[in-house]
């Protein structure tokens, strides 16, 4: 029995990340090789962006994906999010030269307030929302607060890029396969303050912390490398990390939808107060996923160094939340 198509809304669909993302969704990499999809693609309602979106759709057509059951172009979230089962909010306003962070928060605040309200009005009541557009945690917080009729747990922010970056650095340091790394955690904000924590991580049952056994490397090389990786890629490539961000979005949604088989992954989720993180703060936590639901990994010990790092990233997030409080 073939499955009924699900509706996947993607914003910023003609952008760099959108271009790296859509073909992989349509090929079945995100929701499985037996799940047809209808793509509901949103771009800003100006002629140039809509024309570019049409070009992307022409290419999607030309791939003749068996799982692509339909697609639509939209300039309004109220139509783009209609009955959406999944929503990937990729589009956001990047920080321009000389733009203050407060200004960036305000501009994106308006975008994500409107998108949260639209999801609240027209999306499926079980819609799974992933915010990719930066500042991702705060944009997800705004969207969640703007959608009071949808469950809080349906809103998530993307920390998977930080998680994957951290795994890659650990694999390089230990000379082991990245696929064998388990129980890695990234706490906090998707920003250079995030705290990638390998204290619980294992490779084929062996402790990563014992293998590396170098706190100076952890504090002075590993954490800054992971935290500033996005800036390093812009410096090298002249463009932001679009393909790796799209890959992380696929990983995040696939694991949420199809499960992690008991493995830990990192998701930005609204806190319920665990680990001392105030309720509703959109924070990177370790989770496992099963039957379309994520579950927080609880009871992990937080040592003094980790607490200091968690406090630092929390402080930044609370500052961002305060900066958008007037919008909510």
Curated annotation (Swiss-Prot):
Catalytic activity: (S)-malate + NAD(+) = oxaloacetate + NADH + H(+)
EC category name: oxidoreductase
GO BP terms in the entry: malate metabolic process; tricarboxylic acid cycle
EC number: 1.1.1.37
Gene Ontology molecular functions: L-malate dehydrogenase (NAD+) activity
Keyword annotations of the record: NAD, Oxidoreductase, Tricarboxylic acid cycle
Record flagged with keyword Oxidoreductase: yes
Family annotation (CDD domains): MDH_chloroplast-like
Annotated binding of NAD(+), by residue: 12-18, 108, 115, 132-134
InterPro entries tied to this protein: L-lactate/malate_DH, Lactate/malate_DH_C, Lactate/malate_DH_N, Lactate_DH/Glyco_Ohase_4_C, Malate_DH_type2, NAD(P)-bd_dom_sf
Superkingdom assignment: Bacteria
Catalytic residues as annotated in Swiss-Prot or TrEMBL: 190
Function statement: Catalyzes the reversible oxidation of malate to oxaloacetate.
Protein known as: Malate dehydrogenase
Gene this chain is encoded by: mdh
């Amino acid at each position: 029995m073939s499955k009924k198509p699900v509706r996947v809304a993607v914003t910023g669909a003609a952008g760099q990340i959108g271009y790296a993302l859509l073909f992989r969704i349509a090929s079945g990499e995100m929701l499985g090789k037996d799940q047809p999809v209808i793509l509901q693609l949103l771009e800003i309602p100006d002629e140039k962006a809509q024309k570019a979106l049409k070009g992307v759709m022409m290419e999607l057509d030309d791939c003749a994906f068996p799982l692509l059951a339909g697609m639509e172009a939209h300039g309004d979230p109220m139509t783009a999010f209609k009955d959406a089962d999944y929503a990937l909010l990729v589009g956001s306003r990047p920080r321009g030269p000389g733009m203050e962070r407060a200004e960036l928060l305000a501009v994106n605040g308006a975008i994500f307030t409107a998108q949260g309200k639209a999801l609240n009005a027209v999306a499926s009541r079980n819609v799974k929302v992933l915010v990719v557009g930066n500042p991702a945690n705060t944009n997800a917080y705004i969207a969640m607060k703007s959608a009071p009729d949808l469950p809080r747990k349906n809103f998530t922010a993307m920390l998977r890029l930080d998680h994957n970056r951290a795994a890659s650095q650990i694999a390089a340091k230990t000379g082991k396969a990245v696929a064998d790394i388990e129980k890695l955690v990234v706490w906090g904000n998707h920003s250079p303050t995030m705290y990638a924590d390998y204290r619980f991580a294992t490779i084929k049952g062996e402790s990563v912390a014992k293998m590396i056994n170098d706190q100076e490397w952890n504090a002075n090389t590993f954490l800054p490398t992971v935290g500033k990786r996005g800036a390093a890629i812009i410096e090298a490539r002249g463009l932001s990390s679009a393909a790796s961000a799209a890959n992380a979005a696929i990983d995040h949604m696939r694991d949420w939808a199809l499960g992690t088989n008991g493995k830990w992954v990192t998701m930005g989720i609204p806190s319920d107060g665990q680990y001392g993180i105030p309720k509703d703060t959109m924070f990177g936590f370790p989770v496992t996923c099963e039957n379309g639901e994520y579950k927080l990994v609880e009871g992990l010990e937080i040592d003094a160094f980790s607490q200091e790092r968690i406090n630092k990233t929390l402080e930044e997030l609370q500052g961002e939340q305060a900066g958008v409080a007037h919008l909510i």
